[in-house]
Design a protein with these regions (language model features):
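Acidic, low-complexity Ser/Thr/Gly/Pro-rich repeat segments typical of extracellular/periplasmic
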Residues: 41-174
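A short beta-strand segment in extracellular, disulfide-stabilized domains
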Residues: 68, 522-530
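Surface-exposed, proline-enriched loop/turn segments that connect beta strands in immunoglobulin-like
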Residues: 54-56, 511-515
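Surface-exposed, flexible coil segments in extracellular/virion-facing regions
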Residues: 541-558
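Sequence-level preference for short, compositionally simple segments enriched
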Residues: 172-505
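Solvent-exposed loop segments of extracellular immunoglobulin-like
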Residues: 531-539
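Conserved Ig-like domain signature around the intradomain disulfide
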Residues: 536, 565-569
């Protein structure tokens, strides 16, 4: 090869090497701005960010939004600071040192809640600020290099200037006294967190207010007090999820034990008195007329992680709380109710004393699942002045292989009154033959007169009576006709809950019937879901006229013909009120005729 071509070949190699080095030095990760694309440079070996939320230059951002970064690979927390600054004056409004894994903040006006400022799920790092931002303000985010790394230790190069990640918050809050507030994790609602919406409601609220939570997972601890007349309503029971790993080790109650000897009932003390548990996922303290419906509360504390309620209601004997169509997940102490509450159509699982408190509480049509052998479904500590926990038409079951559980336990020397009554309940093998437990196993009823462990018509899945022959000595088997009055009384929520209260919730439609287009001969199912107490009646209509026999939540047409086309809706009612669904249009499409000359074989 002559020298001229040798030089050209060397030059070409140098160009390729230079381009490769340039690519390594300036590998680009594209992060979407609102309405445009903007490159963010980082080294090829570095952890690459592919998206941020709120988007760059986003507007109308919720004040309570978490910040989220999506990476090309799974991140871990490194070292460094994250800052949020006011773009108008470059003042830092929040600084997070990522090496400090746990911080403290006020929630719902109560100080000293521990929380995780950064939560990583798969490729997404969510950053939680200690307080809400301000309305009508532009902010930018700075992140030091190395604050996040990939699992090989390669750093995220961060954001270092005011233009890299900036956004503007909503211009103004919702109208004062608004009767509905919308929470949406994607930022399309009035608030991005459930707590943010609750905080907006004024103390002593007298206006019935619905906080509607769209589908999504909300990683937050909820606490509020003095916020009355609230309905917390999820868009979808399984897909609207409030979750957090809060527990007694993470948020220990430094103010004392609410159940210490001589302590007042938990729902009677002010929140700032100190004797209020901070360990639950969702805590409502001293509120009245609270309804929680159509969502999931999941305390993600692992088994053995100490007491970890999914829901704590610290009310009074006049709290008038309604919990309906709610799934509750945890292990130890899943549900604690101190005060008046009606619980309907709920799923509750846990392993030790996973339903407990002072009551009075009435459970109807609930599924209760034990996750451990030989443990306890309940531990009820009601005062003599009110009833405890009553279960009607509920199922006591266990996870696969779980057996030998007690329906309840108590130590009468410490808590002399404990009332747990089962009416028409289904008991599986998860419940042991003894059924109940006292600290002193053979203690006679005469020595614990205020312990009421009573059952009527406990049966298995085939409807056969449960064998009561081995029940604890103190337990009582109610029978007809002798115990007819007691059976009737304990089957009535008004009797159990007291204060002359009959739980009522006018129907709230949670899933509307959907329009559909089908061909002749196909099957059609129209349906609607509601939260309501008592259970509602349904009447489907076509073109505004009642359809005979269409009186269920689902209306089915087995084989559609052209005459079925039209507008359908359902009227749903109970003694508390009536609601009419949106119109669902049924379009019937005729099979198309083939045209043209058929092909000959």
């Amino acid at each position: 090869m002559n020298d001229k071509y040798r030089w050209l070949r060397v030059a070409a190699v140098l160009v390729v090497v230079w381009l490769g080095c340039l690519a390594m030095t300036h590998a680009v990760a594209v992060i979407a701005r609102e309405g445009e694309k903007a490159p963010v440079t980082s080294q090829q070996a570095a952890l690459i960010a592919t998206a941020v939320f709120p988007a760059i230059n986003a507007k109308n951002v919720c004040l309570d939004t978490p910040l989220r970064i999506t990476f090309a690979s799974g991140p871990i927390v490194g070292d460094g600071e994250i800052q949020v600054l006011d773009a108008s004056n470059d003042i830092v409004v929040e600084t997070i040192n990522v090496s400090v894994r746990i911080r403290s903040k006020s929630i719902g006006g109560l100080p000293n809640f521990n929380y995780y400022p950064i939560i990583i799920n798969d490729h997404v790092a969510s950053i939680y600020l200690s307080h809400a931002l301000a309305y009508n303000t532009t902010y930018y985010v700075k992140i030091e290099a190395g604050a996040f790394k990939d699992r090989s230790g390669n750093p995220f190069t961060g954001f270092t200037n005011a233009e890299a990640w900036r956004f503007k918050t909503k211009a103004a809050p919702p109208v004062a006294g608004a009767k509905e507030l919308v929470v949406a994790a994607d930022g399309t609602g009035d608030f991005a967190s459930v707590q943010g919406a609750i905080d907006f409601v004024p103390p002593g609220n007298k206006t019935p207010t619905t906080i509607f939570i769209r589908q999504g997972t909300y990683n937050e601890i909820i606490f509020f007090t003095g916020k009355d007349n609230l309905t917390i309503l999820g868009e979808d029971r399984q897909k609207t999820i409030i979750a957090y790993a809060n527990n007694d080790r993470f948020n220990n109650n430094a103010g004392g034990n609410p159940f210490a000897p001589g302590a007042p009932l938990p729902g009677t003390v002010p929140a700032r008195s100190g004797a209020v548990y901070r360990r639950g996922l969702f805590l409502a303290h001293r509120v009245t007329n609270l309804t929680i419906a159509n969502l999931t509360l999941h305390n993600t504390t692992p088994q053995g992680g100490s007491q970890a309620e999914a829901l704590i209601l610290n009310g009074t004997p006049r709290a008038r709380a309604i919990i309906t169509n709610v799934d509750l997940y945890s292990f130890q102490d899943t549900l604690q109710i101190n005060g008046q509450a009606f619980v309907q159509n709920c799923y509750i699982e846990g392993d030790v004393d996973f339903m407990w408190g002072t009551g009075p509480s009435f459970f109807e049509n609930c599924e209760l699942k034990a996750l451990r052998n030989g443990a306890y479904f309940t531990q009820i500590r009601n005062p003599i002045s009110n009833h405890g926990y009553v279960f009607k038409n509920c199922t006591f079951e266990g996870a696969p292989g779980i057996t030998g559980n007690f329906l309840s336990r108590i130590a009468p020397a410490r808590f002399p009154a404990s009332e747990v009554v089962l009416i028409d309940c289904l008991l599986t093998d998860a419940v042991g033959a003894v059924g109940w437990r006292l600290d002193q196993v053979n203690q006679p009823a005469s020595e614990a007169p205020n312990v009421h462990y009573w059952e009527y018509n406990s049966h298995d899945s085939a409807g056969r009576p449960v064998d009561m022959s081995q029940r604890l000595v103190i337990a009582r088997h109610l029978k007809l006709p002798d115990d007819g009055k007691s059976i009737a009384n304990y089957g009535d929520p008004k009797f159990v809950l007291g204060d002359d209260w009959t739980p009522l919730l006018a129907p709230i439609i949670t899933t509307q019937p959907a329009s559909v287009s089908v061909s002749i001969g196909q099957k059609v199912i129209l349906s609607a879901s509601v939260a309501a107490v008592p259970a509602p009646k349904y009447q489907w209509q076509k073109s505004g006229r009642n359809i005979t026999g269409a009186a269920q939540s689902v209306y089915a047409i087995g084989s559609v013909d052209s005459r079925d086309a039209g507008s359908y809706r359902v009227v749903i009612s109970n003694i508390a009120g009536k609601v009419t669904s949106r119109v669902a249009k049924l379009t019937v499409v005729s099979a198309r005729r083939r045209t043209g000359i058929p092909r000959l074989p």
